[in-house]
Structure formats: C-alpha cells, structure tokens
C-alpha cells in the first residue's frame, strides 16, 4: 500500500509525469510519483510505502 505526499522539491504546476516521478524517486527517496490534480492546479505527488 502506498501513501501519497505532495512533493517537497517540485515548484509550480506539474505537466510532466516522467519528470515528477524521477524527481520524487531521486530527490525525495519515494517509490513513485505522478502529476495529480489538487485544486487549483496539477501538483507533483510522491508515493511512499506506508
């Protein structure tokens, strides 16, 4: 099971799933990452093992 947490290193609107995922894994030691709509814009969200 994965828990999601907004990226702490991504700035601005998320428009590239691949870059978001790479940044979550590389910089934040997450297992996965993707762009997800959180009002008012798409944000980079990182996924960790709970």
From Swiss-Prot:
| Any one annotated GO CC term | extracellular region
| Localization, UniProt | Secreted
Kindly list the cysteine pairs connected by disulfide bridges: 3-50, 14-35, 20-44, 24-46
Query: Which SUPFAM superfamilies does the entry link to?
Result: Scorpion toxin-like
The protein's UniProt keywords, in alphabetical order, are: Antibiotic, Antimicrobial, Disulfide bond, Fungicide, Plant defense, Secreted
Q: Its Gene Ontology biological processes? A: defense response to bacterium; defense response to fungus; killing of cells of another organism
Stored InterPro entries: Defensin_plant, Scorpion_toxin-like, Scorpion_toxin-like_sf
Q: Which domain of life is it from?
A: Eukaryota
Q: What is its main location?
A: secreted
Q: In which tissues is it expressed?
A: Detected in seeds (at protein level).
Q: Does the keyword Transit peptide apply?
A: no
Checking Pfam families in the record gives:
Gamma-thionin
Query: What biological function has been recorded for the protein in this entry?
Result: Antimicrobial peptide with antifungal activity.
Similarity remark: Belongs to the DEFL family.
User: How is this protein named in the record?
Assistant: Defensin D4
Q: Which organism is it from?
A: Nigella sativa
Its taxonomic path starts at: Eukaryota, Viridiplantae, Streptophyta, Embryophyta, Tracheophyta
């Amino acid at each position: 099971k994965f828990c999601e947490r907004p990226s702490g290193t991504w700035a601005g609107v998320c428009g590239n799933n691949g870059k978001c995922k790479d940044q979550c894994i590389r910089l934040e030691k997450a297992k996965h990452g993707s762009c997800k709509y959180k009002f008012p814009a798409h944000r980079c969200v990182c996924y960790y093992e709970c």
